[in-house]
């Protein structure tokens, strides 16, 4: 894209909206299944994911301010950081969520390899991997929720 600031702003807004929705759902799920421990569990999961999120934000700012010619790296780096955040939070989530972490890890490095050919910042390198990753996460959490609800 020819407008890196618009790219960064758009994806930052998408990340914030996504984080808010995840927080609301995580809190509701935690209250349903772990009523007394809900706040502690949500806080612990957020604390484990937060370093990856902060690193992604700082990477974006640093590359934009000091090395704008390398902004094409951001989509792949963000995906790798999301994978690390998921792996860090995995012990509080259903085991199958590790597959989502693996998806983002592989997708991130694939995006870096593909982007290295022309060094362009494309919305597709963010959109496609995140739609697949978030859909996979939603499906796995839904399946895990059904399994938990079915237990006596």
Placement of each model-derived feature along the sequence:
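Membrane-embedded alpha-helical transmembrane segments of multi-pass integral membrane proteins
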Residues: 17-18, 59, 82-85, 107, ...
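Membrane-proximal helix-loop-helix units in multi-pass membrane proteins
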Residues: 40-97
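C-terminal ends of transmembrane helices
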Residues: 21-40, 84-92, 135-142
């Amino acid at each position: 894209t020819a407008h890196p600031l618009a790219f960064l702003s758009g994806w930052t807004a998408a990340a914030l909206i996504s984080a808010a929705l995840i927080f609301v759902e995580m809190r509701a799920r935690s209250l349903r299944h772990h009523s007394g421990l809900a706040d502690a569990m949500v806080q612990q999961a957020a604390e484990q994911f937060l370093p990856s999120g902060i690193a992604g934000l700082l990477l974006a700012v640093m590359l934009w301010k000091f090395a704008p010619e390398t902004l094409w790296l951001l989509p792949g780096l963000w995906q790798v950081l999301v994978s690390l955040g998921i792996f860090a939070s995995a012990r509080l989530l259903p085991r199958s969520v590790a597959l989502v972490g693996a998806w983002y890890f592989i997708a991130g490095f694939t995006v870096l390899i593909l982007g290295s050919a022309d060094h362009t910042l494309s919305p597709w390198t963010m959109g496609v991997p995140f739609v697949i990753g978030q859909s996979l996460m939603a499906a796995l959490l839904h399946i895990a929720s059904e399994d938990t609800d079915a237990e006596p």
